C-alpha cells in the first residue's frame, strides 16, 4: 500500500504555559510563525528553525478547543513529549544553550551521531544530534 500524501508532521507539545519555553527556543534562533492568545496569555505558538517546526499549546487552550468527550479520550494533560532534532553543529547548540538543564551529557552513539539532550522549561526532553561522516569516508 502506498504511503499517504503527507505534507507536514509537526509535534504539538501541550504545556501549562507557553511564555516560559520561548527563551529556550529564542536562544536557538527560532522564529515565531504563529502566536494565538488565550485570555491574557499565549494559548498557542508555532516556532520554526529552518524547515523544522514545533508547536506549543496550553492545557487551557486545548480544553477550550476540544469537546469534553474528546478531551477525556486523550487523558490528563500536560504530558512530556520527547523531541529529536538533527542539527548541523552540536557545538553551536551547546554554546547557545549553556546554562540550560542537561538530561543527556554529550555522547557518541554507535549509529554515528554526537548527541546532547536538554530539558525545555516545561520539562520536555529535546535531544540534539549531529551525524558525522564515517571515519573512512
PLM features: residue spans?
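Amphipathic alpha-helical segments
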Residues: 17-32
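Vicinal oxygen chelate
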Residues: 1-12, 28-85, 92-119, 130-137
Amino acid at each position: 500500500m502506498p504511503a499517504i500524501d503527507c505534507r507536514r508532521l509537526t509535534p504539538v507539545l501541550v504545556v501549562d504555559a507557553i511564555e516560559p519555553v520561548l527563551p529556550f527556543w529564542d536562544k536557538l534562533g527560532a522564529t515565531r510563525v504563529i502566536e494565538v492568545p488565550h485570555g491574557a496569555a499565549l494559548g498557542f505558538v508555532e516556532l520554526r528553525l529552518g524547515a523544522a517546526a514545533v508547536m506549543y499549546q496550553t492545557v487551557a487552550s486545548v480544553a477550550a478547543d476540544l469537546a469534553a468527550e474528546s478531551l477525556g479520550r486523550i487523558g490528563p494533560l500536560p504530558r512530556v513529549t520527547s523531541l529529536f532534532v538533527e542539527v548541523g553543529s552540536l557545538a553551536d547548540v551547546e554554546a547557545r544553550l549553556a546554562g540550560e538543564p542537561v538530561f543527556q551529557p554529550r555522547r557518541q552513539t554507535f549509529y554515528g551521531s554526537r548527541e546532547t539532550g536538554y530539558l525545555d522549561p516545561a520539562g520536555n526532553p529535546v535531544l540534539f544530534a549531529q551525524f558525522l561522516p564515517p571515519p573512512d569516508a
